Amino acid sequence: MAHDPLEYLQSVLHRSTSYTYRMSFKIDASIANADERAFAAYSRLGEEIGLAFHVIDDQLNVAPVTEEWSKTTAEDIAAGKVTLQVLLILQRADRNRAAELVRILRASTTDQRELRNAVGIMRERGALIEARAIVGQHLDACLRIISNISNMNFRYRP
């Protein structure tokens, strides 16, 4: 059965990173005795924050904003990790460039020339820009949720 790779990645992230955030927000909502609507909003807020965090973390791994970035640049590529940027490239790159990226990922190489090549493939096809836009969509969703939370009922009792 064929699945959309982006939907698959979203489901993986839903079960991993966003789960951590979602659960902490659910605990907060429970402590505040949030009504059902507020509880659902807090859960969704945690999920959106978790998804945004995961995607931006993957992006910073291949395109850090400072030299002092604590992770080794492109370590996800060296580990053969399939990220949102990789899936976007596989959907839009020509066969040769997609095959080149897959080859580098499968090699689990630490060769800096190969890693720069992989990052270059992601840049030239706009995957990093599109991933950043997806982060923006998650953050916009967070803002919408937050703006509605003030209208919800909490029955906090110390």
Q: Which ranges hold each PLM region?
A:
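All-alpha prenyltransferase/terpene-synthase fold signal
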Residues: 1-158
